[in-house]
Amino acid sequence: EHIDEVLARPKLVGQVFRKRVMSFQVTDSLQHTLKAIRKRKYTQFPVDEGDVFQGLVTTVGITNWLATSMAGTHFPRRTPILQDILHHEKNEVNYKFISRYITIYEAEENFKHGVERGRRFEALLITEHGKPHQKLIGIVTPIDIMKVD
């Protein structure tokens, strides 16, 4: 009976993953971001320029930036900003915007289709209708989807 209920009315991502989203600005320092990573235990952060979304910074992108920076003999003297890190993300587009009205099963399919096309999404970014100019109201990662019962 429970299975019938779940299949008949699957949960929507907006119900399950709605939360206050912590975003940064492209001019924020890497140091500031690392403090947030340590404090909040997040691995992806939306980055804006003013109110305009610019990309998703991940711990993988930070590691790629660090590896590139350390390839030379000198560590950069200027404190890196998130704009520097965005250029080192493995996929420039490592995210997809989705509507809060899609089901968790549709969200899972988005992750699967991304992998099938060779473009793995680090996160699905939830807005009212899946439009980039709308306010972010949640983030879903592949691990989040696996934890939903």
Functional labels for PLM-detected ranges:
Residues I37, F45-I62, F111, G118-D144:
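A glycine-centered beta-loop-beta connector
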